[in-house]
Every structure is written in C-alpha cells, then in structure tokens.
C-alpha cells in the first residue's frame, strides 16, 4: 500500500495527483475521521481498478519546521473569495491558467506548504465547467457557492516541495479495522 511505502521509503511527491485543492503535494489532516474515510475510499478505488484486496491505513506524521529553511506558506481560510479562487485555480488545466493569465495557483510549487479547509464538491464542478469552456473564471460568483451553512469542514495541510517534506517525520502507520464506522458516517464531515 502507499502507506507502507511512505513508512519504508519516505514521502515521494511524484505520486501526487495534479489537480488538488492546493496543487500537487502530500496532504494531511488533523481530522482522524476524515483521514480514515479518505484512506478507505482511496483503497476501495485502487482495489476495484487493480483487482486487489489491499487494506486501508492511516499514517500519523509530525511536522517540525526548521526556521532556517524560510518555507513559503500559503494560508487560505474557508468561505473567502481568495480561498475559492486559489482552490479553483489549482484544479484548472495549465492551458486555462495560461489563457486567462491566472498566476495565483500552486501547480508550480511556489508555496512549500499550504493550509486551509478542505473543499467540497462545488469547486470541482465549477473547475470542470471552466476546463470544458462552459464558464470563464471572471464570471464566477464566489459568494454564490461559498455559502456559509454553518457546516465546518476539516482542515488540511499540504506539503509541496522536498524542503517541506524534509520537515515531516512518520510517527506510526496503523490499519483501519472498523471501516463500517467511517463509511456509515459519509454524510458527516
């Protein structure tokens, strides 16, 4: 599993997917429940695609910044237009970033670390429309889809450079035994 690879070989950024909330990187969350659900879902998709029977794991890490490194950190609080634009921009194809002269993204790893709330499905749907040419970024009304319904989304911390990864220490790696507990809580965040 990827968790076992992290424990045995360290974090390798080449395995990151390209169009994530804060750009390609290694993502963590202080929410055990969210991490467990994400691990279960990812493992289920992997098993279905590859006809495997892997088990989901949670890797617990500790982050200790080294002050001499001068890490560039992006902070993006939820329910702000700045957060919405940044997350959307990271989900756009490079040709869209170029066509609309969008510079505020992290697909190039300009930020070593980013943190903020995890996006819901709304931004993914909007990015799909922008990438498909159905919507242009200037026409997006962020207030419309960043409604504050009182729901609190888990925080995420993402690491995008080797410099940032070097500050992470793996503490433990544990198999998730009670998968039903997390799958039954799907509606909750």
Language model feature labels by segment:
Residues 16, 49-50:
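Short consensus segments that form the blades of beta-propeller domains
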Residues 1-27, 33-44:
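Glycine-rich loop/turn
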Residues 20-21, 36, 41-48, 55, ...:
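Conserved NAD+-utilizing ADP-ribose enzyme module
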């Amino acid at each position: 599993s990827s968790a076992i690879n992290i424990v045995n070989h360290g974090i390798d950024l080449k395995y990151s997917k390209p169009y994530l909330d804060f750009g390609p990187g290694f993502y963590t969350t202080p929410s055990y429940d969210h991490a467990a659900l994400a691990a279960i879902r990812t493992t289920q998709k992997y098993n279905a695609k590859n006809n495997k029977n892997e088990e989901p794991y949670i890797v617990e890490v500790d982050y200790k910044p080294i002050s001499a490194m001068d890490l560039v950190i992006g902070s993006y609080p939820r329910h702000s237009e700045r957060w919405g634009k940044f997350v959307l921009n990271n989900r756009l194809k490079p040709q869209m970033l170029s066509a609309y002269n969008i510079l505020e993204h992290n697909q190039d790893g300009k930020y070593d670390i980013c943190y903020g709330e995890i996006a819901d499905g709304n931004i993914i749907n909007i990015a799909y429309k922008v990438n498909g040419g159905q919507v242009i970024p200037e026409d997006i009304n962020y207030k419309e889809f960043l409604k504050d319904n009182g729901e609190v989304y888990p925080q995420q911390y993402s690491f995008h450079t080797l410099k940032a990864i070097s500050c992470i220490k793996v503490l433990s790696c544990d198999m998730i035994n009670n998968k039903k507990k997390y799958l039954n809580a799907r509606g909750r965040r």
